[in-house]
């Protein structure tokens, strides 16, 4: 009788363990699948490029329109060459963009450049010699200063502003994806 009870208990434990392991694996698969779907970019069927993506304005005068055509009203005229914008959608030769203040509209694709620029979104941030909080500062950058993005690694991005190069905290700038 004692051996039978132990076998029954052992059999129940094995059955429970198998079920628990299957449920655990299914949940792990669902969580990983959801995480990869949320972080993945959509690939545009028009250009083959990811959406959303960052680009910059080619010229000093670029119209932001309500829709993807010259027939639509101009809502805003940008007058800042290299201003970074994020392409969120595409329609023919038009790109729906959002700027760092959240304004959205349509810009003709030839007025955009694939060159990557950033804009300072904090009131002030320090341009540093090296990537690190203990590094010496080279300059204080004010809000809306535009710089050329060279690369990002971890918390820091290496940028160029006129003839200065240095590191700035990624969270203080706009024009980079969260994944960088």
Describe these PLM feature segments.
Residues 1-16:
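N-terminal secretory signal peptides that target proteins for export/translocation
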Residues 23-33:
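Bacterial N-terminal signal peptides
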Residues 37-66, 77-81, 88-129, 137-145, ...:
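SH3-family beta-barrel domains
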Residues 69:
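Second-shell loop/turn segments in exported
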Residues 73-75:
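Non-catalytic, beta-strand-enriched accessory regions in extracellular/secretory proteins
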């Amino acid at each position: 009788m004692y051996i039978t009870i132990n076998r029954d208990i052992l059999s129940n434990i094995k059955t429970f363990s198998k079920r628990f392991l299957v449920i655990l694996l299914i949940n792990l698969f669902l969580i990983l699948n959801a995480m990869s779907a949320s972080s993945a970019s959509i690939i545009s069927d028009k250009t083959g490029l990811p959406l959303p993506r960052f680009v910059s304005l080619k010229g000093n005068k670029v119209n932001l329109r309500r829709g993807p055509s010259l027939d639509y009203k101009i809502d805003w005229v940008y007058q800042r060459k290299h201003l970074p914008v994020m392409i969120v959608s595409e329609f023919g030769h038009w790109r729906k963009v959002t700027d760092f203040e959240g304004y959205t509209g349509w810009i003709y694709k030839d007025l955009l450049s694939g060159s990557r620029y950033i804009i300072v979104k904090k009131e002030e941030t320090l341009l540093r010699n090296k990537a690190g909080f203990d590094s010496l500062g080279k300059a204080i950058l004010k809000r809306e200063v535009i710089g050329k993005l060279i690369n990002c690694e971890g918390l820091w991005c290496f940028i160029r502003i006129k003839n200065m190069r240095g590191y700035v905290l990624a969270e203080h700038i706009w024009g980079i994806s969260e994944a960088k």
